[in-house]
Amino acid sequence: VLLNKHNFNFYITTDLATSEKKSADFSVVSVWAYNSNGDWLLVDGFRERCLVDKAIEQVFRFVQIYQPQGVGIEVSGQQGGFVTWIQNEMIRKNTWFTLTSSRNSSLPGIRPVTDKFSRFMTVSPLFKARKIMLPNELKEDPFLVAMVEEVSLVSRNGFKSKHDDTLDTISMLTEMNPWKPTNDTSMTYNPHSGLWELDDEDDDNIGSSINSYIV
């Protein structure tokens, strides 16, 4: 993906916590590449117990790297003031990006109307259709390890994992109103590795670790 950024539109989803205490939730920022086939490919992420200013700083860092088409920020409960905070930071940093609106609103920010589990159930068909892909080269990264663990512990009755912060960033994908890039990006299944690989114009890059995804 990173070798072919021009073939994707990028989106950022978040779940920002308000405390760095050991008992607090994690702040999570997930970066996704969206291709012409409607697939979501995870490309980067941040997960840490920290004050919200550090998490917002991470959002801006990812924005500079990936130039996303939209950034999802939840505005419910204690997170209600995050949009204004980020808008003020845009002015201060002279860095501008689109804050995605919910499908039922024109205001910036994601406004959930159901509980966390119900929201995740709306994205579960994407997993079944193999439309959400996770990078094989990050399989040892703590961020992806946490995400895979949380996803694997979702049951029909609810979340069984201790934390659900990365799940929230996955659920937000259904609210991102994405648009597909004009460049076509095809993926080929490699039966030897069990991975989906991005077709690259440079044959030497086909099958490299950065091009390989698990679903």
Give the location of each predicted region.
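Conserved phosphate-binding/catalytic loops in two-lobed NTP-binding clefts
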Residues: 94-119
